[in-house]
C-alpha cells in the first residue's frame, strides 16, 4: 500500500519512529498571481476560479459541504478537488486541523490563523514578495512549528499547502537555488506545461544575480506558503516527526530548508523529515519527481498506492489519467491513515467515495465484476 521511492532506509526509520503516532494536519494557504496566467494550472477552470481555490478548499475542509458555502468549490477542468481525499481522512481519523493564511486575496469564511502575509505578485516580475515579508513569514513558521510540536508531542505534523500556481513558483525557487529542476516538476495538467513554466521563471531570474540567498530567491520568484512551511519544518524537527505533504511544491520547500540551514547555520534534524505525496505525482511520466528528489538527497519520498481505477465516480477515475494528482495534503493523509490505522485500498476508497456521495448527492453503485 505504501511505496518508498527514495532513501528507503531513512524512510523506514521515520516510519518506525513516527508511523504509529496520530497525525496533526496543518495546511498553509497562500496565493500567487502566477496562478492567474491562462493555462498555468488546472486547479480551477478560469483565472477567476483559481483566485478562490484555496479559500474554497479551506471552507470545505472545515465544513465538509458546499451547501450554503460562502465560497463553493470551483469547477476544475476535470475531476474533483483533492480536498475530498483529505477531508474524508482527517474526519475518519479525528485529526486536529490547523489552517494558516500566509497570504490570500480575501480571507476564508472559516477560522484561520492569520500570519500577516500577502499574496505574491506574478513571478514573471522578479519581485514576487518584499524581502522583509519573506523574513517575517519564516519567523512565523519557526514560532508555529515549535509551538505545534510542543502541543502535540505524541503526534507528528503533516505540513500541507494550497497554492494555485505553486508548482511554477516551486520551479522558480528550485532553479533560483541552483538546482537543475527543468523538466522534473509536475502540474495539475495531465501533461506538464514545462515550457510555459520555464519561460516564466527564466524571464524573472534573468533580472537577478545568480548568487541569491534562499530568502532572496523566494522574494524574487516564490510564494508566501514556502517560507512558512520551511520554518515550521525546521523548528518542529527538533522534537517531532514532520511529513512535508506534497510533491514538487514540498520538494522545493525541502530545498529551501537545506539552503536556509546552510546559509543561516540553523539546526534541523533531517532524519525527522520525509516528503509524502501521491503515486499520481511520483509516477507522472510528464515530470520526474523521483529524479528531483534524488537531486536533493537525502530526502525520503513516499506515496500510497491508492488507486481510483475501480471508483464508481468519473471525478475520481480521472486521477488515473493524470488530472489533479495532489493538493491539500491528500497523499500524506492517505499515508497517515495507512500507517496509523493500517487502512488499505478498500477502506480508503470507501471513505472518499462516501464523502462524495454525501456531498454530490450521487448514489454510489458498485461496478459489475
Swiss-Prot record:
GO terms for MF: nicotinate-nucleotide-dimethylbenzimidazole phosphoribosyltransferase activity
Record-linked InterPro entries: Nict_dMeBzImd_PRibTrfase, Nict_dMeBzImd_PRibTrfase_arc, Nict_dMeBzImd_PRibTrfase_sf
Top-level division of the source organism's lineage: Bacteria
Family the UniProt entry places it in: Belongs to the UPF0284 family.
The protein's name: UPF0284 protein sll1500
Amino acid at each position: 500500500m505504501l511505496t518508498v521511492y527514495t532513501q528507503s532506509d531513512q524512510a523506514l526509520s521515520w516510519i518506525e519512529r513516527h508511523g504509529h503516532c496520530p497525525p496533526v494536519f496543518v495546511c498553509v494557504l497562500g496565493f500567487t498571481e502566477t496562478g492567474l496566467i491562462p493555462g498555468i494550472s488546472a486547479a480551477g477552470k478560469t483565472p477567476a476560479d483559481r483566485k478562490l481555490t484555496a479559500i474554497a478548499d479551506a471552507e470545505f475542509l472545515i465544513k465538509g459541504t458546499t451547501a450554503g458555502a460562502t465560497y463553493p468549490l470551483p469547477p476544475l477542468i476535470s475531476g474533483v478537488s483533492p480536498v475530498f481525499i483529505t477531508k474524508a481522512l482527517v474526519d475518519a481519523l479525528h485529526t486536529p486541523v490547523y489552517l494558516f493564511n500566509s497570504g490570500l486575496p480575501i480571507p476564508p469564511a472559516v477560522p484561520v490563523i492569520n500570519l500577516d502575509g500577502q499574496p505574491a505578485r506574478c513571478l514573471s516580475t522578479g519581485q514576487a514578495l518584499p524581502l522583509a515579508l519573506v523574513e517575517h513569514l519564516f519567523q512565523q513558521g519557526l514560532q508555529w512549528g515549535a509551538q505545534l510540536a510542543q502541543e502535540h508531542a505524541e503526534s507528528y505534523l503533516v505540513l500541507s499547502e494550497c497554492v494555485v500556481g505553486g508548482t511554477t513558483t516551486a520551479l522558480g525557487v528550485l532553479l533560483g537555488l541552483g538546482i537543475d529542476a527543468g523538466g522534473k516538476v509536475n502540474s495539475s495538467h495531465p501533461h506538464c506545461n514545462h515550457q510555459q513554466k520555464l519561460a516564466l521563471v527564466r524571464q524573472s531570474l534573468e533580472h537577478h544575480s545568480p548568487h541569491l540567498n534562499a530568502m532572496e530567491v523566494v522574494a524574487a520568484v516564490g510564494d508566501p506558503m514556502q517560507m512558512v512551511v520551511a520554518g515550521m519544518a525546521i523548528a518542529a524537527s527538533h522534537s517531532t516527526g514532520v511529513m512535508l505533504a506534497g510533491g514538487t511544491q514540498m520538494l522545493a520547500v525541502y530545498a529551501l530548508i537545506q539552503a536556509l540551514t546552510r546559509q543561516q547555520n540553523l539546526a534541523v534534524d533531517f532524519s525527522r523529515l520525509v516528503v509524502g505525496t501521491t503515486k499520481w505525482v511520483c509516477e507522472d511520466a510528464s515530470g520526474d519527481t523521483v529524479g528531483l528528489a534524488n537531486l536533493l538527497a537525502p530526502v525520503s519520498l513516499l506515496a500510497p498506492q491508492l488507486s481510483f481505477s475501480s471508483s464508481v465516480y468519473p471525478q475520481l477515475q480521472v486521477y488515473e489519467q493524470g488530472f489533479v494528482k495532489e493538493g491539500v495534503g491528500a497523499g500524506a493523509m492517505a499515508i497517515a491513515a495507512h500507517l496509523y490505522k493500517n487502512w488499505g485500498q478498500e477502506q480508503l476508497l470507501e471513505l472518499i467515495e462516501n464523502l462524495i456521495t454525501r456531498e454530490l448527492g450521487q448514489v454510489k453503485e458498485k461496478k459489475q465484476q
